[in-house]
A protein has these predicted regions:
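N-terminal secretory signal peptides and thylakoid transit peptides that target proteins
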Residues: 1-14
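Ubiquitin-like/PB1-type beta-grasp interaction modules and other compact soluble beta-rich domains
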Residues: 8-9, 20-152
Length: 152
């Protein structure tokens, strides 16, 4: 009976070793490059980014490069390289970002907000200063604010 216990224990430890120890493919956990606050406001209403569907723990399509976690209101950036504001928005579940004909275009929950459309304005702010989201590379502590307004 003791022999079976030892065999099961050794098999269990061997099975866990891939989760607990770094191998040739990984040098350890990704480095936290930064975190800060984020708010998205569409026509005066804040998007509740604390909903489970936006959190890395619950989302099917989250990115380590830029993501949210349950339990706080911060964005997190991990990985090899920092991302731009635009890349961060594009990495969030249920959001997409593109730049076309000199205009910002954000899709949220299937609704497209195109800066080329009359009456549609997208404003990207970092620490209350307007930035070009395709050029601004996020830094630790940045307070991000995306304001989308439409007429009608």
């Amino acid at each position: 009976m003791r022999r079976r216990t030892v065999i099961v224990w050794v098999a269990g430890v061997a099975g866990l070793s891939g989760c607990l120890f770094a191998d040739d493919r990984h040098d350890g956990p990704p480095e936290l490059l930064g975190f800060g606050e984020i708010e998205v406001v569409i026509d005066g209403s804040s998007v509740d980014l604390s909903e489970d569907r936006f959190q890395a723990e619950h989302a099917d399509n989250y990115s380590l490069a830029f993501h949210l976690h349950e339990g706080d209101d911060f964005w997190y950036m991990e990985g090899e390289e920092p991302v731009t504001f635009a890349e961060g928005i594009d990495a969030l579940p249920y959001f997409a970002y593109e730049h076309a004909s000199g205009a910002d275009i954000v899709t949220y929950d299937g609704a497209v907000y195109d800066g080329r459309d009359p009456g549609t304005e997208l404003t990207f702010l970092v620490d209350d200063d307007e930035v070009d989201p395709t050029q601004y590379v996020l830094s630790d502590g940045d307070d991000l604010h995306l304001e989308i307004t439409t007429e009608g």
